[in-house]
Swiss-Prot record:
Protein name per UniProt: Ribosome biogenesis regulatory protein homolog
Position(s), cross-link Glycyl lysine isopeptide (Lys-Gly) (interchain with G-Cter in SUMO2): K154, K226, K266
Gene Ontology cellular-component terms listed: condensed nuclear chromosome; endoplasmic reticulum; nucleolus; preribosome, large subunit precursor
GO biological process: endonucleolytic cleavage in ITS1 to separate SSU-rRNA from 5.8S rRNA and LSU-rRNA from tricistronic rRNA transcript (SSU-rRNA, 5.8S rRNA, LSU-rRNA); hematopoietic progenitor cell differentiation; mitotic metaphase chromosome alignment; protein localization to nucleolus; regulation of signal transduction by p53 class mediator; ribosomal large subunit assembly; ribosomal large subunit biogenesis
Gene giving rise to this polypeptide: Rrs1
Modified residues (Citrulline): R273
Top-rank taxon: Eukaryota
Region feature (Disordered): 200-255, 272-365
Modifications made to the protein after synthesis: Citrullinated by PADI4.
Organism: Rattus norvegicus (Rat)
Length: 365
């Protein structure tokens, strides 16, 4: 029994070792192409096993992927290794397969105004050397920048032009001109950036006119500006004949949380009475008077507009020889006099008007 058990153990160990070798060693009819720089293995063998697998080749696909991965790992173990911070690493070679880009190619930079002008006129840039001979110092110096040749800022004497003011400081004028050139270059640079990003420039994106503002809008804007201080307009100075602003602010009075149950009951009952009452809440007299006032204002605005047009036309005459905007002739009828109705609405309820008999009542404001 002991001999059989030893033989069985040896056979089992031999079988396990063979299985391990079988897992590591993979045989292929055609050798795989490896690109170790990208950790890529290309299998050119025909997939005969997959064709025989039928409609569900998942197991065959897993086995094929495992074999190809094993071959790739075997190639990695053949690479030279080195120790980096107590870790053994393998240095991969340069990749041989060119992979596609993750992102699209960068767009070309938009041309500046000078580049567009140069392309239009056919101007080609000429390459200049950085160093030039300076006759004053007798040595080679830079063409631009610090310690450049023919540096006029280092001159201690400046000739005053004949057309210039003899009392003007030419040194300060030169510094001021240089600052203006720097500011102009910066403005052109910002314009090029805005043109490249398709932004709207301040010249065309500034504040636009809001049209004519009425008296109410101006008063509201003035009131808002006055209460925009830290003291909410309490210590704001007023003009000599300026009126106090109406409705500038009222403190909200809250009812007590506990105590006055009678007043609370009264308010709730009043609210229920108003909600359950069938009487309409609209004041007909007030609504009618408001409508009449609006119509009067519209007609007054129209008459004012017509009178302004007549003043603008002046002494210009029509084809009949009569001045435009002048009084009508005897044969014509005036609008709003006998023969025409001035208003097509009923008289005001309880109101008072010129030329209309008063029927009593007061006009509510």
């Amino acid at each position: 029994m002991e001999g059989q058990s030893v033989e069985e153990l040896l056979a089992k160990a031999k079988q396990e070792e063979a299985e391990k070798l079988q897992r590591i060693t993979v045989h292929k009819e055609l050798e795989l192409e490896f690109d170790l720089g990208n950790l890529l293995a290309s299998d050119r063998n025909p997939p005969t096993v997959l064709r025989q697998a039928g409609p569900s080749p998942e197991a065959e696909l897993r086995a094929l992927a495992r074999d190809n991965t094993q071959l790739l790992v075997n190639q990695l173990w053949q690479l030279p290794t080195e120790r980096v911070e107590e870790a053994v690493v393998a240095r991969l070679p340069e990749p041989a397969t060119r992979l596609p880009r993750e992102k699209p190619l960068p767009r070309p930079r938009p041309l500046t105004r000078w580049q567009q002008f140069a392309r239009l006129k056919g101007i080609r840039p000429k390459k200049k050397t950085n160093l030039v001979w300076d006759e004053v110092s007798g040595q080679w110096r830079r063409r631009w920048g610090y310690k450049r040749a023919r540096d006029d800022t280092k001159e201690w004497l400046i000739e005053v032009p004949g057309s210039a003011d003899p009392m003007e400081d030419q040194f300060a004028k030169r510094i001021r001109a240089k600052k203006e050139r720097v500011a102009k270059n910066e403005l052109n640079r910002l314009r090029n950036l805005a043109r490249a990003h398709k932004m709207q420039m301040p010249s065309s994106a500034g504040l636009h006119p809001t049209g004519h503002q009425s008296k109410e809008e101006l008063g509201r804007a003035m009131q808002v500006a006055k209460v925009s201080t830290a003291s909410v307009g309490r210590f704001q100075e007023r003009l000599p004949k300026e009126k106090a602003p109406r409705g500038s602010g009222k403190k909200r009075k809250f009812q007590p949380l506990f105590g006055d149950f009678a007043a609370e009951k009264k308010n709730q009952l009043e609210l229920l009475r108003v909600m359950n009452s069938k009487k309409p809440q609209l004041d007909v007299t007030r609504a009618t008077n408001k409508q009449m006032r609006e119509e009067d204002q519209e007609e007054a605005a129209k008459r004012r507009k017509m009178s302004q047009k007549g003043k603008k036309k002046g002494g210009r005459q029509g084809p009949s020889g009569r001045r435009k905007g002048g009084p009508p002739s005897q044969g014509e009828k005036r609008k709003g006099v006998l023969g025409g109705k001035k208003h097509s609405r009923p008289p005001a309820l309880g109101g008072k008007k010129k030329g209309v008999p008063h029927h009593g009542g007061k006009r509510r404001k």
